[in-house]
Swiss-Prot record:
Membrane topology qualifier: Peripheral membrane protein
Compartments reported by the entry: Nucleus; Cytoplasm; Golgi apparatus membrane; Cell membrane
Assembly information from the UniProt record: Monomer or homodimer. Interacts with CAV1; the interaction forms a stable heterooligomeric complex that is required for targeting to lipid rafts and for caveolae formation. Tyrosine phosphorylated forms do not form heterooligomers with the Tyr-19-phosphorylated form existing as a monomer or dimer, and the Tyr-27-form as a monomer only. Interacts (tyrosine phosphorylated form) with the SH2 domain-containing proteins, RASA1, NCK1 and SRC. Interacts (tyrosine phosphorylated form) with INSR, the interaction (Tyr-27-phosphorylated form) is increased on insulin stimulation.
The organism of origin for this protein: Equus caballus (Horse)
Post-translational modification summary for this protein: Phosphorylated on serine and tyrosine residues. CAV1 promotes phosphorylation on Ser-23 which then targets the complex to the plasma membrane, lipid rafts and caveolae. Phosphorylation on both Tyr-19 and Tyr-27 is required for insulin-induced 'Ser-727' phosphorylation of STAT3 and its activation. Phosphorylation on Tyr-19 is required for insulin-induced phosphorylation of MAPK1 and DNA binding of STAT3. Tyrosine phosphorylation is induced by both EGF and insulin.
Intramembrane residue windows: 87-107
Post-translational modification Phosphoserine, affected residues: S20, S23
Main localization (coarse): nucleus
Annotated function: May act as a scaffolding protein within caveolar membranes. Interacts directly with G-protein alpha subunits and can functionally regulate their activity. Acts as an accessory protein in conjunction with CAV1 in targeting to lipid rafts and driving caveolae formation. Positive regulator of cellular mitogenesis of the MAPK signaling pathway. Required for the insulin-stimulated nuclear translocation and activation of MAPK1 and STAT3, and the subsequent regulation of cell cycle progression.
Protein name (Swiss-Prot/TrEMBL): Caveolin-2
Keyword presence, Secreted: no
A GO biological-process term: vesicle docking
Xref: Pfam families: Caveolin
UniProt entry keywords in alphabetical sequence: Cell membrane, Cytoplasm, Golgi apparatus, Membrane, Nucleus, Phosphoprotein
Amino acid sequence: MGLETEKADVQLFLDDESYSRHSGVDYADPEKFADAGLDRDPHRLNSHLKVGFEDVIAEPVSTHSFDKVWICSHALFEISKYVIYKFLTVFLAIPLAFVAGILFATLSCLHIWIIMPFVKTCLMLLPSVQTIWKSVTDVVIAPLCTSAGRSFSSVSLQLSHD
């Protein structure tokens, strides 16, 4: 049994096992992590990170290194990636989480207690400012524009060809 789709007299049959349900980006399978505990990236914020050996280092068909070199470099890549990541997270995760918490707490506080009250105050004052601006426009700017229009309406240009 396969997947059948029809479009413009074309049929496509695929096996369910070989059919990839995602397009291009290799998303982590949530069921795969159900046994290991919580999914640490439930919103798939870092699904674009491809740090596998084959995604970083690739040899074209015309230039291959020795098999032992390829195997050793693959092993060293994976081990160093694992060890360095663990080392960096031990020393950087807690301080960076602390700094990010302070930053987001500060931004949230500023947004809640300063920015939104300021925006609401401006929105409350805008109808009054609009009324005052309309009055200033009607009293000062409209007569100036009317008199300038009348003055320039009496100007006539004549072009002569000499």
